[in-house]
Design a protein with these regions (language model features):
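N-terminal beta-hairpin/loop module of FHA
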Residues: 1-34, 94-96
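ATP/adenylate-binding site constellation spanning eukaryotic-like Ser/Thr protein kinases
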Residues: 8, 37, 56
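C-terminal boundary/linker segments immediately following FHA domains
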Residues: 11, 44, 55, 61-99
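Short coil/loop residues immediately preceding or within conserved phosphate-binding loops
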Residues: 20, 37, 46, 70
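Acidic side chains
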Residues: 22-24, 53, 79
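Short beta-strand-initiation
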Residues: 35-37, 76
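Buried hydrophobic-core signal for structured, non-transmembrane domains
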Residues: 40-42
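Short aromatic-glycine-enriched beta-strand elements
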Residues: 48-50
Length: 99
């Protein structure tokens, strides 16, 4: 999955199509992996990208460390993010310049 982050986004699951600001992980078996409806937020806090756990039931982990709820933690390219038991790898890509 590829994301552009002009504003904060929530990672989670929803039964409602088009939930504002929510990246719905249902297609990745989110419920079976213990992903909460509003699990965590990814947002830019220049010069960083941060992840914030939203008090999820099954936890948010960054590189194996469980995040405390409501604490912003910087994320780097190559980091492993786990929501419940759903594993992801964070990779940054340069934007193509349009000339």
């Amino acid at each position: 999955m590829s994301l552009d982050l002009p504003h904060p986004i929530v990672l989670g699951r929803s039964g409602l199509p088009g939930s504002d600001g929510l990246i719905d992980l249902t297609d990745y078996d989110a419920r079976q992996h213990g992903v909460s409806r509003r699990h965590c937020i990814l947002e830019r806090r220049d010069p960083y990208l941060v992840v914030i756990d939203l008090g999820s039931t099954n936890g948010t982990y960054l590189n194996g460390d469980r995040l405390a709820p409501q604490q912003a933690v910087p994320v780097s390219s190559g980091d492993r993010l786990i929501l419940g038991t759903l594993h992801m790898m964070i990779t940054f890509h340069e934007r193509a310049s349009h000339q």
